[in-house]
Amino acid sequence: MHFLIPAAGSGSRMKAGKNKLLIDLEGESLIYWTLKSVLSANSTNWVGIIGQPKDKNLLLNSAKDFAQKVHWINGGDTRQQSVFNGLEALPKDAKKVLIHDGARCLINPELIDLCAKQLDENEAVILATKVTDTIKIVDKEGFIKETPDRNYLWAAQTPQGFLVDRLKKAHKMAIDKKWKVTDDASLFEILNWKVKIIEGTYSNIKITSPIDLKIAKLFVKNP
């Protein structure tokens, strides 16, 4: 399985002053923990890190021995552009790809393998968890408009997996039509292409704030 890891997070909400994947988690960087999980999956055989050139040496150095097992890909101005760059950099024989947020450093390798396996039967899959909170849709003034049935609500995670040719086609259409999305599954939604949900775990958090880092430390100490 070919694997792409967008790794250009600025860390502004973390107030880190650097790429957030360089932040320390129990003695190792976030990118180290992410690569440890990804490379532990039985299905992983090729990994590309997509980041900004200025961060290349810092990220690869902090990845330690794992750096020798990955390929560096220069990212774009947005996550969407970076993923497209990653797709263009895949080996020509790549048929399937998993895309995973670099800041989700606690992904279970078994879930990676499950996503890879599900791509044998589906053209697109994503990890997600059932929403447990009541969600409100509000208007521009901040007043509640409606409350959707949470039985149909899932919180999207990564990895998200796709057939390479299909995802490339979706990204090229997005460029032509100037679509802006925050994850790759959204492109499939716009095109009315099916995406299969695979239930993930609540421990697969994305490190975006200081409280997330505190939670991640608890999971690392108590796996």
From Swiss-Prot:
GO BP annotations, alphabetical order: isopentenyl diphosphate biosynthetic process, methylerythritol 4-phosphate pathway
Enzyme Commission number: 2.7.7.60
Top enzyme category: transferase
Biological or metabolic pathway of the protein: Isoprenoid biosynthesis; isopentenyl diphosphate biosynthesis via DXP pathway; isopentenyl diphosphate from 1-deoxy-D-xylulose 5-phosphate: step 2/6
Site (Transition state stabilizer) residue list: 13, 20
Keyword match Transferase: yes
Residues the UniProt record annotates as site (Positions MEP for the nucleophilic attack): 150, 206
Any one Gene Ontology molecular-function term assigned to this protein's record: 2-C-methyl-D-erythritol 4-phosphate cytidylyltransferase activity
UniProt cross-references to Pfam families, sorted A to Z: IspD (PF01128)
Keywords for this protein: Isoprene biosynthesis, Nucleotidyltransferase, Transferase
Keyword Nucleotidyltransferase listed: yes
Cited CDD domains: CDP-ME_synthetase
Reaction(s) the record says it catalyses: 2-C-methyl-D-erythritol 4-phosphate + CTP + H(+) = 4-CDP-2-C-methyl-D-erythritol + diphosphate
Purpose of the protein: Catalyzes the formation of 4-diphosphocytidyl-2-C-methyl-D-erythritol from CTP and 2-C-methyl-D-erythritol 4-phosphate (MEP).
Family membership noted in the UniProt record: Belongs to the IspD/TarI cytidylyltransferase family. IspD subfamily.
This protein's name: 2-C-methyl-D-erythritol 4-phosphate cytidylyltransferase
Species this protein is from: Prochlorococcus marinus (strain AS9601)
Gene this protein is translated from: ispD
